[in-house]
Amino acid sequence: MINYNPLLCLDFYKTCHAEQYPKGLTRMVSYYTPRMSRLADTDKVTMFGLQAFIKEYLIDGFNKYFFERDFEKEILPEYKRVLGATIGTSGVGKERLLKLHNLGFLPLIINAIPEGTRTNIHVPQIEITNTLPSFVWLVNSIETMLSCTMWHTQVSAEVGYRYRQIVNKYADLTCDDDVDR
C-alpha cells in the first residue's frame, strides 16, 4: 500500500499534460496494453491484479492519502516541494487538483477483460475513461501507477500458469483417474 500522496506516484512529465490537451476535450480513453513478456519464450500475459490495484491504490490509497488530507496544508505543499525539486512547479495545476480533492472520488470508469484471462502480448486488457468532462487529465495520469503495479502481478500469474501446466502434464502421466486438468 502506498503511504503518501498518490499523485506523487505518477510520471512527473505528465503533470503538464492537462495544459497540452486541446481546448474543449471532454473525454479521454486510455488502454493498458502489455508490450512484452518478462518471461522467455512466451507471447502471452495473464490478466491479473486489477481488482487489487483498484482497491489498494485507487480507493484506499487515494482516500487515505489524498481525499482525507487537508489540501492547502498537506497535499499542495508536499506536491509543490517534490515537483520543485525535480521538474519545477509550472505544471502543478493547483485548480484541477483542488477540484479533484473537493470532488472526493476518482471520476473514472475502468473496463477490463476478466482476471485470469491469458491474452497475446500487444492486446489491450484494460480501458480507462473519465466520467466527468473536466477530469480528462486524470485518465493518463494514473497509467504509471497502474503499469508499475500490474506488471509484477501479471508476471507472477504467468509463472503460476506455467507451473500449473507442468503439474497437469505429470499428473496426467502418473495418475489413474479420469479428471480433466
Predicted segments — roles?
Residues 1-181:
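Ordered alpha/beta subdomains of enzyme catalytic regions
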